[in-house]
Amino acid sequence: MIQNVVGFVLGNLPAILFIAAFVLAAITRSPSYFPARLLGWLLLSVGIAYTWAGFFHIAFPHMAASSIGWQVSPFQFEIGVADVSIGIVAIVSFWRSLDFKGPVVGYLSLFSIGVAYGHFREAIYEGDYSKNNFGILLGITLIHAALLPVLYLLARKKRA
């Protein structure tokens, strides 16, 4: 039973963190503007999720590749390092200023668009509909790409 729960949580960590960001932004008692709070919590959740994914690409490349429906590649190490790097910067941004968050949001949005394109391409041309290639993770990636810049711009507008 415990093993199943742990497996479920670890296998669905990005989705759980995504939902938790909205809940925490809603219940956090803070005078800050809601989009700014949500931006912070989403960046923290994205940071943890990217660090987690990067760790798997680096330490367990066979497991990471098979969950996406891909073959193991030497490039997994590079994407793992990129994921861990932006993950750590996104985590740090939770405690930093809006000016610090801006470039993090920009990078995450552009990177997410590229990642989504790659996963769509694999689904369309290679028929790869694995859950971690063309499932909820892809949906969350697309939402991050669109929502993070909107929240950032709303927070900047309110601050101005």
Model-derived features with residue positions:
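Core segments of alpha-helical transmembrane spans in multipass integral membrane proteins
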Residues: 43-59, 74-91
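Juxtamembrane "helix-exit" motif on the non-cytosolic side of transmembrane helices
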Residues: 28, 58-65, 118-127
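Membrane-water interface at the C-terminal end of transmembrane alpha helices
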Residues: 21-25, 92-93, 144-160
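Membrane-interface helix-boundary motifs at transmembrane edges
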Residues: 27-42, 95-101, 129, 160
